[in-house]
């Protein structure tokens, strides 16, 4: 907003400059001492400005509405003048064209009747063509229904074959699972056999170890016995040498008896110990032999059972392989049969679609011809209705003209100038050529 105390503005308003120079205290209520407007004054000025703008917009809108109204009034006045001229022309030409109009409408009526008869003949021929095509359409529908039934039958056959195929696949998967189970059982039996072989090897190793241990202990015992024998021989020789030194017979007998008794006692103890050791060793060997025999018998029984199980599994696997090969051959035959049926179904469907499209094209052509005939018939009916309306309108005009003529003859003699004739001759065409808008304007 501009400053009211601007020097350029004060130069243009000398009275305001004198008031400001006379005293700053005598300012109006809307202006402050610094020369600017107060907030209240600014608000009032803005409201006044908005009101002025709104009034300007309303005045412009009213001006536009008034201009449109004036244009409409002028247009309606021009139309009224045109209609008055047309009414004058019709009044002047009524007494000259009354007979010609009747003849013209009679000829047009006859031509319309001929057109209606031709259209009826066309409609009858179209109906005959439709009746001729009805058996083809019925046969096409029957073929369609039969093809649908064949399609349903083929689908049912396909589903049954798919069911058989799924059963064969299920049996195949079951056989494969049994084969894997047999392979697992075979691997388990092989692992059990390997474990038993390792146990046998371990038992043989323990047996060899114990045998070597006992043989070493027996060798050591023999060495100890030989040492004891050598010591005893040495002691005996010493005693014999001592006895030889003793020359008395009594001592000799005593030593001989003691020596024989000691030797007998040693021999008895040795035989007793050897018998006990032999008995213990024989018992231990018999025990170990029985244990080994029992282990070998259990191992042989397990091995025989495993061998029988392997033979049984092999027979089952061979049987399953034969069934699997048979099912695979049947599966291949069914797949080939399904492919052949698919191809045959597609071919039949393609041929049927071609025939159906041809029939549909024929039906569409007949429908188009029927629609064209119906449109032409509607046009003819509309033309007939318009002609009847025009005849009624001209009849009313003629009646009005006759009424005006009688009234003029009874009251006032009216000398009307003859109507201007066209250069190319009298007008005999129908107002129907101008369309329905001209008829509405006449009405």
Swiss-Prot record:
Residues 105-239 are annotated as: Coil 1B. Keywords: Coiled coil, Cytoplasm, Intermediate filament. Residues 59-90 are annotated as: Coil 1A. InterPro entries: IF_rod_dom (IPR039008). GO terms for biological process: heterochromatin formation; nuclear envelope organization; nuclear migration; nuclear pore localization; protein localization to nuclear envelope. Cytoplasmic intermediate filaments provide mechanical strength to cells. Not essential protein. It is found in: Cytoplasm. Residues 404-443 are annotated as: Tail. Belongs to the intermediate filament family. Residues 55-405 form the IF rod domain. It comes from the Eukaryota. One of its GO terms (molecular function) is structural constituent of cytoskeleton. Residues 91-104 are annotated as: Linker 1. This is Intermediate filament protein ifd-2. Its main location: cytoplasm. Residues 1-58 are annotated as: Head. The lineage of its organism: Eukaryota, Metazoa, Ecdysozoa, Nematoda, Chromadorea. Residues 258-403 are annotated as: Coil 2. GO terms for cellular component: cytoplasm; intermediate filament; nuclear envelope; nuclear lamina. Residues 240-257 are annotated as: Linker 12.
